[in-house]
Amino acid sequence: MVLVSMLMLTLEIHAASAATSGNVSSTSEMDWTPVMDAIIQVESKGDPKAKSGNSVGVMQITPILVAECNNILKRKKSKKRYTLADRYNVAKSKEMFLLIQSVYNPLNSIERAIRSWNGGNHYKKKRTQRYFEKVMKLLKK
């Protein structure tokens, strides 16, 4: 766990350094695939039909998250919009994850991505600890 923490700190320092030098790595340049795949395993074990309350699909996306993605797209003057049915589509679920990261995680913090996916943008570290550890365990494999 110490090694993982050091790795994440190093990534965050590098991202912060890049941001101050004007070389900000955009979310599109960050390879979020391993993080998304680990989240998918924790959330649904890869079942695109998974459902728990209002959360559905491989990434257990809520209607509120779909609405937030559409608000972001609207602010970006994009005509694209997501539907509630898109939560069952693996590729579109990953697109929504990436869109959220691009806005709410500009430094591409892996820890922030994992914790906020579980606890929202104003997550509490203590409440997201078990989830974070589950995802990190899969990332280490």
Language-model features: locations:
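Bacterial N-terminal signal peptides
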Residues: 1-12
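Catalytic glycan-binding domains that act on GlcNAc-containing polysaccharides
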Residues: 17-141
